[in-house]
């Protein structure tokens, strides 16, 4: 079962042969062969400890947690575009 409070972590590696080792820390979502990074998800409560732990590995060059859970996605007072509103009324 997927936890509702999960957060993404991006880990840049020196070599992709270590990408499989990251599976024990969370759910690996994407591995970039060209840019040598791994995107995986884990519980939001474990993120600070995982960032410290992953940074200590010799094969990790950089670790960045995702800020998406902290960004407000509900916009108040957004003005609709008049041209699109007119097109919707015409049925285009």
From Swiss-Prot:
Subcellular location(s) per record: Cytoplasm
Source species, domain of life: Bacteria
Record keywords: Cytoplasm
An annotated GO cellular component: cytoplasm
Record-annotated disulphide pairs: none
Main location (coarse class): cytoplasm
Stored InterPro entries: DUF2129
UniProt cross-references to HAMAP family, sorted A to Z: UPF0298 (MF_01126)
Record-linked NCBIfam families: PRK02886.1
Family from the record: Belongs to the UPF0298 family.
Name the UniProt record assigns to this protein: UPF0298 protein ABC2380
Protein's organism: Shouchella clausii (strain KSM-K16) (Alkalihalobacillus clausii)
């Amino acid at each position: 079962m997927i936890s509702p409070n999960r957060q993404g972590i991006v880990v840049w590696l020196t070599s992709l042969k270590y990408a499989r080792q990251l599976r024990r820390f969370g759910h690996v979502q994407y591995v970039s062969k060209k840019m040598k990074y791994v995107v995986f998800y884990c519980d939001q409560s474990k993120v600070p400890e995982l960032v410290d732990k992953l940074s200590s590995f010799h094969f990790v060059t950089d670790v960045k947690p995702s800020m998406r859970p902290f960004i407000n996605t509900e916009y108040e007072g957004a003005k609709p575009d008049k041209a699109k509103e007119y097109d919707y009324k015409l049925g285009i």
